[in-house]
């Protein structure tokens, strides 16, 4: 349990931890490449360590420094693991590594913690089977643990109906070791870090935005070359502080080196649409990814907003903190087309609705989202996080700006993506 009290102001600057999506991919592509890859400023958290441990278990040599990780690439020639591979709480690790393991002519078993064992895997297992991998598991391969025997893959064309970046990434990385061309079609573009990074590692990736959706193609047999990858600050982690500065009584916060990839900046677009005071400075591009410093100041009134299904992929991880902003807005805000939230570390729709109602906010729940009636009368109370890091951090921000005391249960769950969250809050607020 952690007690949260109201702040007087926000101040100073912060470089939140590096982007989780980019860190996972840098570690994995570094292992798949030939030669060495230097990953600068990686996020070291529960999820990314799960990826590193699995790579080590299939005999990747890794040297971990304070601000960098050096990976000796194996050019897709891994060794059969002695033991079960554990993705812990990380869906990204489980799904992308399924694609990598499918290229290997050996047997492996992939599992996860209790939460991950309940998350759907068929979305990645089915296309990998179609490519030729032999995969079995609980509920016909839909739930971890799954057993994989890979090798001899052939390219396929696959319609990725959920626009899942994890599925797309798994298929592209499997496609590099498949015969012919592998093509992924999405109704709308999901986060594109894998495509950008594959190009950084020297692969040719063809992207075609078309009427029937966004198409990504990769030709089998290409070799990745080790390189240097710089990891910018995670926009999902920065979002909590941008929201805090927006709702604070006074002050300003500068958030440094925040990733502004157009497939990931939906939260900031919505914050601007709500009337947020945010400016972007020092814009630049490193390792094929755009970033900038954000300066955020408080505003008195927030306008309500609607999030449509096609906007959801650009802000899926920020919906809990966006919901907190919506609770303070002047009117009714709505999120639709976000059913995917029910299959995250917790059922996030249920978690958002339950906790906001507990604090006196009127909320309507839909199968694929919710509607929030903004109010100035938000009460205190005990937040049930469902051990979900994003729920804990979102409601911590709420607790810092309401009069009554808010208590967060299982505050330690933030270590999944942001181990220093509680310390960082103290750096930028005055009570």
Swiss-Prot record:
Any GO BP: aromatic amino acid family biosynthetic process
Catalytic activity reported: 3-phosphoshikimate + phosphoenolpyruvate = 5-O-(1-carboxyvinyl)-3-phosphoshikimate + phosphate
CDD domains, alphabetized: EPSP_synthase (cd01556)
Catalytic residues (UniProt): 317
Enzymatic class: transferase
Localization per record: Cytoplasm
Any one annotated GO CC term: cytoplasm
SUPFAM superfamilies listed in its UniProt record: EPT/RTPC-like
Signal peptide start-end: none
Residues binding phosphoenolpyruvate: 20, 91, 119, 166, 348, 390
Keywords: Amino-acid biosynthesis, Aromatic amino acid biosynthesis, Cytoplasm, Transferase
Pathway as given in its UniProt record: Metabolic intermediate biosynthesis; chorismate biosynthesis; chorismate from D-erythrose 4-phosphate and phosphoenolpyruvate: step 6/7
Binding site for 3-phosphoshikimate: 20-21, 25, 164, 166, 317, 344
InterPro entries named in the record: Enolpyruvate_Tfrase_dom, Enolpyruvate_Tfrase_sf, EPSP_synthase, EPSP_synthase_CS, RNA3'P_cycl/enolpyr_Trfase_a/b
EC number(s) reported in the record: 2.5.1.19
GO MF, any single term: 3-phosphoshikimate 1-carboxyvinyltransferase activity
Family matches, as Pfam families: EPSP_synthase (PF00275)
PANTHER family hit by this protein: AROM/DEHYDROQUINATE SYNTHASE, PENTAFUNCTIONAL AROM POLYPEPTIDE
Function of the protein: Catalyzes the transfer of the enolpyruvyl moiety of phosphoenolpyruvate (PEP) to the 5-hydroxyl of shikimate-3-phosphate (S3P) to produce enolpyruvyl shikimate-3-phosphate and inorganic phosphate.
Subunit-level organization: Monomer.
Protein family according to the UniProt entry: Belongs to the EPSP synthase family.
Protein known as: 3-phosphoshikimate 1-carboxyvinyltransferase
């Amino acid at each position: 349990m952690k007690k949260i009290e109201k702040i007087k102001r926000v101040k100073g600057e912060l470089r939140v931890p590096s982007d989780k999506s980019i860190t996972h991919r840098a570690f994995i592509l570094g292992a798949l490449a030939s030669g060495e890859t230097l990953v600068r400023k990686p996020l070291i958290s529960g999820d990314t360590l799960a990826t590193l441990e699995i790579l080590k278990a299939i005999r990747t040599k890794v040297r971990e420094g304070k601000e960098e990780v050096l990976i000796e690439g194996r050019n897709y020639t891994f060794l059969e693991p002695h033991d079960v591979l554990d993705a812990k709480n990380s869906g990204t690790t489980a799904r992308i590594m399924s694609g990598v393991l499918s290229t290997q002519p050996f047997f492996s078993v992939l599992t996860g913690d209790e939460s991950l064992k309940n998350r759907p895997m068929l979305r990645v297992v089915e296309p990998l089977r179609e490519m030729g991998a032999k995969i079995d598991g609980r509920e016909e391969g839909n739930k971890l643990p799954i057993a994989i025997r890979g090798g001899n893959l052939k390219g396929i064309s696959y319609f990725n109906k959920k626009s899942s970046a994890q599925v797309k990434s798994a298929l592209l990385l499997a496609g590099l070791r498949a015969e012919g061309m592998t093509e992924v079609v999405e109704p709308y573009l999901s986060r594109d870090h894998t495509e950008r990074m594959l190009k950084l590692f020297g692969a040719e990736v063809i992207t075609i935005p078309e009427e029937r959706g966004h198409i990504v193609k990769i030709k089998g047999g290409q070799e990745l070359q080790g390189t240097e990858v710089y990891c910018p600050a995670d926009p999902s982690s920065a979002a909590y502080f941008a929201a805090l500065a927006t709702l604070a009584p006074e002050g300003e916060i500068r958030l440094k080196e925040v990733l502004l990839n157009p497939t990931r900046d939906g939260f900031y677009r919505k914050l601007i649409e709500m009337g947020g005071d945010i400016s972007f400075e020092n814009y630049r591009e490193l390792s094929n990814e755009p970033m900038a410093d954000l300066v955020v100041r408080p505003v008195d009134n927030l306008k309500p907003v609607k999030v449509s299904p096609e906007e959801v992929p650009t802000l899926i991880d920020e919906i809990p903190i966006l919901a907190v902003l919506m609770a303070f807005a002047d009117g009714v805000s709505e999120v639709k087309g976000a059913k995917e939230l029910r299959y995250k570390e917790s059922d996030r729709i249920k978690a958002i609705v339950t906790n906001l109602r507990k604090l006196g906010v009127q909320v309507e729940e839909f199968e694929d989202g919710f509607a929030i009636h903004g109010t100035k009368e938000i009460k205190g109370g005990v937040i049930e996080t469902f051990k979900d890091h994003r729920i804990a951090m979102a409601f911590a921000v709420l607790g810092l700006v309401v009069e009554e005391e808010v208590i967060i249960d299982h505050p330690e769950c933030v270590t999944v993506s942001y181990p220093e969250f509680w310390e960082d809050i103290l750096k930028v607020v005055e009570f």
